[in-house]
């Protein structure tokens, strides 16, 4: 039987020697970094102790300087948009026509980034997709564009607006010369809550209605309450929380009132709870009869009645 030689034992000295050989020598001025699987060394040439006093280095890499420019979120650019600046700039039929096809407008703005939307013979909105900030008055986001058009209609159909200095709604004096909106133009969003085209608030139900807060605070709050109470009728996804529904209007309220120091309940009291309640009732008076689901129920009831009539004739 062949004798298998035993492996030579490694002495303590040889182990320490191999460890020393595996160590990477590191100078005080060195910095090791990885490029793929390879370790590279950059040596800083100007040192004071273990502090590099400049970026001058053995690889001649020019580092540049990262500027002190803090990210401040929403405060980077102040939103100068004021719905009141757009009073009287839109023709009611032009505005109503665009709002009747708001979904198509949204899709075109998203696809093309920029769309021109003439709201009168002399005023054209430039609608920009995902607009963050601008000081150009007629350059607006999709939601702001819809609010501007809604505002120019509501001024004529309601003949009033909220006056924050008086804390009340005041007449605009347009009743005798108020423009009439073409009744054949359909606001499909208002149709979701079965709001009559004859209602002065027919064009309140638009994307971006929250931007109307400075002119119609009770109306915008009531509209938000409708969305919260009738989310399925308004085709809102189940994933959208009540706080999500309120967030856009809350931003407009905060801009005017500073909610850090003012209480939302006091603001509601200032505007008038009765005003909000009346508007909520106006917007929801026919809502139970609206929508595809209720039409299906009505049809089913008629069909059941028809079946019963067959029984009486046989």
From Swiss-Prot:
Q: Which UniProt keywords apply?
A: Capsid protein, Helical capsid protein, Host cytoplasm, Ribonucleoprotein, RNA-binding, Viral nucleoprotein, Virion
What segments bear the compositional bias annotation Basic and acidic residues?
Answer: 17-27
Q: Give one GO molecular function term.
A: RNA binding
Q: Which GO terms describe its cellular component?
A: helical viral capsid; host cell cytoplasm; ribonucleoprotein complex; viral nucleocapsid
Q: Any keyword Chloroplast?
A: no
The ranges of region (Disordered) come to 1-27
List localization entries.
Virion; Host cytoplasm
Question: In which broad location class does this protein mainly occur, judging by the first location in its UniProt entry?
Answer: virion
- Subunit structure of this entry? Homomultimerizes to form the nucleocapsid. Binds to viral genomic RNA.
Instruction: Report the function annotation for this chain.
Output: Encapsidates the genome, protecting it from nucleases. The encapsidated genomic RNA is termed the nucleocapsid (NC) and serves as template for viral transcription and replication.
Its name, as the record gives it, is Nucleoprotein
């Amino acid at each position: 039987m062949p004798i298998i030689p035993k492996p030579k034992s490694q002495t303590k000295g040889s182990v320490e020697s191999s460890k020393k050989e595996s160590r990477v020598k590191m100078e005080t001025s060195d910095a090791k970094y990885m490029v793929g699987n390879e370790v590279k060394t950059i040596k800083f040439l100007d040192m004071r102790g273990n502090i590099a006093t400049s970026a001058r280095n053995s690889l001649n890499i020019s580092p540049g300087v990262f500027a002190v420019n803090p990210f401040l979120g929403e405060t980077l650019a102040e939103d100068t948009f004021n719905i009141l600046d757009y009073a009287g700039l839109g023709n009611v039929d032009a505005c109503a026509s665009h709002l009747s096809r708001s979904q198509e407008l949204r899709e075109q703005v998203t696809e093309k980034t920029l769309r021109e939307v003439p709201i009168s013979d002399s005023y054209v909105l430039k609608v920009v997709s995902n607009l963050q900030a601008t000081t150009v008055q007629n350059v607006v986001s999709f939601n702001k564009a819809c609010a501007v058009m809604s505002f120019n209609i509501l001024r004529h159909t309601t003949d009033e607006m909220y006056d924050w200095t008086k804390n009340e709604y005041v007449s605009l004096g347009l009743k005798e010369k108020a423009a009439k909106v073409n009744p054949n133009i359909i606001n499909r969003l208002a149709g979701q809550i079965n709001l009559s085209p004859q209602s002065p608030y027919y064009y309140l139900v638009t994307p971006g209605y929250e931007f109307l807060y400075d002119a119609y605070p009770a109306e915008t709050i009531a509209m938000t309450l409708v969305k919260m109470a009738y989310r399925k009728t308004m085709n809102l996804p189940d994933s959208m929380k009540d706080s999500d529904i309120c967030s856009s209007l809350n931003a407009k309220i905060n801009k005017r009132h500073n909610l850090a120091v003012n209480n939302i309940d006091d603001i509601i009291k200032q505007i008038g709870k009765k005003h909000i309640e009346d508007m909520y009732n106006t917007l929801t008076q026919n809502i139970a009869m609206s929508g595809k689901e209720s039409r299906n129920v009505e049809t089913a009831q008629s069909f059941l009645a028809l079946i019963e009539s067959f029984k009486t004739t046989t």
